[in-house]
């Protein structure tokens, strides 16, 4: 089976809420493919939340969409795990004077109403019968001729899913078939569960872009130029910097609509840490994306120079359908004809200090500042020391050598193996 494929009957194992989320993710990807924000898609995320008959609501601020899985810019999806014969359709949307207000409103707005039935896998005549049942149910509405109706069965849903590799990664993971290491957009920097993970853009980290003539930008100044570079270039983009400067978190922010403006399309993001030997390999994944002509942004964390060089040449030759972002601690011999290099480095303790206060609120401002300054702004070193600070302890009187030794302590006991 191809990497981005799945047997349609496997979808039957999705729960109600997973089905709803799948449709929402597909709608987000479809909207983004048309050049609009995924934020145009709203869904409750809970089958128990009152929704008034709406599971997923798409509202794109334009008059018309190009033909595809979304036909009208205002579309309501109703997700159903069970089969939907004529009788079930009539119960769902009502008839005559009992017609659902949601349907009437969609008709008034010249919108679309689509039932997605996971339990159905219809023959052409079966789908025709269900569409007729939907049309008959709304025939008495004064605006019924303006309403677009459709019925998506399991085959239609799998056809839609095959168009969006990142959503395919998500659904395979939900079904326990996930590829080892590969992830859609998410918390790639792997913060502790339950911890606030908004981007810290305080002074203390600088970013140098290839076209910036060596100018060092603060994080909030660099986000939009980084996005513009990734959109415009047909070269691979290499993010370099020492371990602990926040490379992965900054790349994650490029897809975050709450950071800056005009975020990269998170619905096409495919991430992996190559240090964990992913299956399929990064080379196989890229080859598959290029062969199928899929739009994707591949992010390869901890990507060695040799692998980067191999993939960068393929991406550069193929055009802009697949964008490649790699992350690593140094540059080595990257070829400028196939690579744009963005360098990140620490420039003070501010970001590391704020991160410590966020992760260890009981550590106190003074301790956080002392650790961040000692770590020279390196977040990874600072976090490692902070983990070893006792409740109520003050670090003010500790020498640098004593702080350094904290890196080699396990539960208050020195660990010689770590030092070695």
Regions found by a protein language model. Give the residues of each.
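Catalytic centers of nucleases
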Residues: 18-112, 120-127, 161-163
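A short hydrophobic beta-strand->loop->alpha-helix junction that borders the nucleotide-binding pocket
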Residues: 46, 79-80, 240-243, 268-278, ...
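P-loop NTPase Walker A phosphate-binding motif
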Residues: 58-65, 74-76, 90-101, 240-268, ...
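Winged-helix-like regulatory helical subdomains adjacent to P-loop NTPase cores
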Residues: 87-106, 120, 167-224, 231-234, ...
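Amphipathic alpha-helical "lid/sensor" segments that cap RecA-like P-loop NTPase cores
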Residues: 244, 250-251, 332, 337-340, ...
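Conserved AAA+ ATPase "SRH/arginine-finger" region at the nucleotide-binding site
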Residues: 340-355
């Amino acid at each position: 089976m191809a990497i981005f494929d799945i047997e349609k009957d496997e979808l039957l194992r999705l729960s109600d809420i997973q089905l709803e989320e799948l449709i929402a993710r597909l709608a987000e990807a479809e909207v983004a493919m048309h050049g609009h924000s995924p934020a145009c898609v709203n869904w409750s995320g809970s089958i128990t939340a009152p929704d008034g008959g709406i599971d997923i609501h798409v509202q794109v601020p334009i008059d018309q969409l190009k033909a595809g899985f979304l036909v009208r810019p205002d579309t309501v999806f109703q997700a159903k795990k069970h089969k939907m014969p004529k009788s079930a359709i009539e119960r769902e949307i009502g008839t005559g004077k009992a017609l659902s207000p949601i349907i009437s409103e969609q008709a008034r707005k010249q919108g679309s109403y689509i039932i997605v039935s996971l339990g159905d896998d219809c023959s052409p005549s079966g789908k025709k019968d269900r569409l007729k049942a939907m049309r008959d149910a709304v025939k008495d509405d004064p605006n019924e001729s303006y309403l677009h109706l459709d019925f998506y069965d399991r085959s239609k849903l799998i056809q839609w899913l095959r168009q969006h590799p990142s959503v395919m990664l998500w659904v395979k993971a939900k079904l326990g078939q996930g590829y080892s290491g590969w992830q859609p957009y998410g918390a790639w920097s792997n913060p502790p569960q339950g911890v606030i993970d908004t981007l810290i853009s305080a002074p203390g980290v600088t970013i140098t872009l290839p076209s910036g003539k060596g100018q060092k930008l603060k994080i909030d100044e660099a986000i939009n130029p980084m996005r513009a570079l990734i959109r415009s270039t047909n070269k691979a983009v290499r993010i370099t910097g020492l371990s602990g400067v926040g490379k992965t978190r900054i790349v994650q922010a490029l897809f975050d609509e709450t950071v800056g403006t005009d975020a990269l399309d998170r619905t096409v993001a495919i991430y992996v840490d190559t240090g964990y030997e992913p299956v399929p390999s990064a080379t196989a994944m890229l080859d598959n994306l290029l062969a199928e002509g899929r739009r994707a942004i591949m992010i390869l964390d901890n990507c060695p120079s040799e692998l980067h060089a191999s993939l960068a040449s393929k991406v550069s030759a193929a055009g802009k359908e697949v964008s490649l972002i790699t992350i690593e601690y140094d540059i080595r011999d990257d070829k400028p004809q196939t690579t744009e290099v963005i360098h990140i480095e620490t420039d003070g303790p501010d970001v590391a200090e704020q991160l410590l206060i966020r992760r260890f609120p009981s550590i106190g401002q003074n301790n956080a500042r002392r650790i961040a300054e000692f770590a020279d702004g390196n977040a990874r070193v600072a976090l490692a020391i902070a983990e070893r600070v006792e409740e109520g302890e003050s670090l003010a009187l500790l020498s640098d050598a004593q702080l350094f030794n904290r890196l080699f302590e396990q539960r208050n006991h020195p660990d010689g193996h770590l030092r070695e």
